[in-house]
Curated annotation (Swiss-Prot):
Entry protein name: Catalase
UniProt keyword annotation of Phosphoprotein present: yes
Active-site residues per Swiss-Prot or TrEMBL entry: H75, N148
CDD domains named in the record: catalase_clade_3 (cd08156)
Cofactors demanded by this protein: heme; NADP(+)
Main location: other
Gene: CAT
Family the UniProt entry places it in: Belongs to the catalase family.
Any one GO CC term of the record: peroxisomal matrix
Positions where N6-succinyllysine occurs in the chain: K13, K221, K306, K480, K522
Amino acid sequence: MADSRDPASDQMKHWKEERAAQKPDVLTTAGGNPVGDKLNIMTVGPRGPLLVQDVVFTDEMAHFDRERIPERVVHAKGAGAFAYFEVTHDITKYCKAKVFEHIGKKTPIAVRFSTVAGESGSADTVRDPRGFAVKFYTEEGIWDLVGNNTPIFFIRDALLFPSFIHSQKRNPQTHLKDPDMMWDFWSLRPESLHQVSFLFSDRGIPDGHRHMNGYGSHTFKLVNGSGEAVYCKFHYKTDQGIKNLSVEDAARLSQEDPDYGLRDLFNAIATGNYPSWTLYIQVMTFQQAQSFPFNPFDLTKIWPHKDYPLIPVGKLVLNRNPVNYFAEVEQIAFDPSNMPPGIEPSPDKMLQGRLFAYPDTHRHRLGPNYLQIPVNCPYRTRVANYQRDGPMCVTDNQGGAPNYYPNSFSAPVEQRQALEHTSRCSGDVGRYNSTDDDNVTQVRAFYTQVLNEEQRRRLCENIAGHLKDAQLFIQKKAVKNFMDVHPDYGNRIQTLLDKYNVEKPKNAIHTFVQDGSHLSAKEKANL
C-alpha cells in the first residue's frame, strides 16, 4: 500500500514531514530574485509570441540545457553513502598514516559502489565487476582507496586499459554490446583468465552492494614512523555475509527493478540497518617480494592467504544516505594518487597508470577545480599551495598569498617528514611483454580448490552461455585458454558450446583484415 512503502519510495513524503512546521520557501530565480508566476510563460497576448525579456523562462531553460555533466567513462552507474572508519587493531608498526594512529580513532569517509561497463541508467544486476571506492577525509588530506569487489583484474599493463574498456562497451557501428569484441580481447590476453573466471562464477552477480567484499586490488607500499617500508594489499570483508544472485533472479530484477542495488543500500541505511565491512591488510616484506614466485605487483594475481595472512585493521560502517545524489554521488571523484604520508604506490603498472588517469578524467568531467566541490574537499586539513584560478574557482583563491615558490614572504613551505620513502630501482628502459607470464597456475587453483562441483558447473554454464554468441574462431581461442588452465574446464565449456552451436547455427559474417580491406563473407563455421 502507498502508506507503507519503503524509505526510498517515500523520500518526498518524508521530506515534507520533516518540514511540517516550516512555511514553503519563496520561489526564486538562480540569482535569488522572487518569481511571481512559474506556470505561465510571458507572451504578447494569450496567443502571441514569446518575449526574450521573460527571464523566468530563460533562466530556467538555460540551466536545464546544462544540467547533465559528462558521464564517467567507466563506473557510470553507482550508489553512494557516507560512513565512518574506526581503527580496531594497531598497525602502526607498518604504517605511520594518522588514519591508523591509535585504536578507537574514527575517520569520516564516503563510499561509492558501481558497475563498470554499463551506462548511468543500466541495471544493477548485470554480470560485471563492481567498483568499491572509499574516500577517507583525514587530517593529512584525502586518502582514496579506489578498488573493486575482486582482488584481481583483467589486465596487468595500463597501456591496454582503453582497449579493454572499448571491448566491454558498445560496438562503434551498431552501438550494441558485442560478444565478439569482449571474447576476442579476453582470448587474446590470457592474463584475463583469472578475472574472467571470477566474473562468471557465482560472485559475478552480487546481491546488491551490501553482500560483497571490497579490495584495493593493487599492491601498495606502507611506511612506518621509522622509515621502514613493506608492501601491502587491502581487503574489505562484508559483515553481512556474501550473497549472490542467480542468473534467473538477476535477469528478472533487471526488468522489474534495475536500480535494485541502489534501492537496497538506501533502504538499509534509512532504516538503521547500517552495513559494515572489516578492513584487513596483507603485508609482504621487500625480501619476500624478491623471492615471490610471481611478480608481486601483478594485478592479475593474488597473494595466497596461507603465506600472507589477513591482518585486521578496523571497521567501516555506512550510516548516512546522500542528501542529494548529484551533489554527493555523481560529483564525487576518487583518485588513487590521493595518499597521505605512510601510504605510497608500488611498481604495480596498473596502479601507476591510474595515478594519472583518474585525476585527468575528473578534470575533464568536473573541471580543474573539482577538489573544491564539497564532497571532494579535504575539509579536515588546510589546503595551501601555489595553484590558482581556473574555471569554477569558488574559494577565496588563497587571497593575496604568493603564487610562486620559492619566495621570501612566509608562504607555505615543505614538511620534510612528508618525504616519500626512498627506494632503489634499476633496469634497462624498454617495453616489456608480460603476455606469457604464468597466467594459469592461480586460475587452476581457483577452479579445482576454491570452487566446489556445483560452482564449477555453474561457472562453465555461465561462460558457455555468453561465449556462444561469439564467432567460432573466437570460441576456439577462448576454449584453448580454458584448456590450458585445466582440461576439465575447457572440455566442459566446449561440450556446452557444441550443443549451442548445433541448436543455433552461425550466420554468414563479414571479416576485415587488420588494414581494413574487405574480405568476402564466410560462414562462421569455416573460420
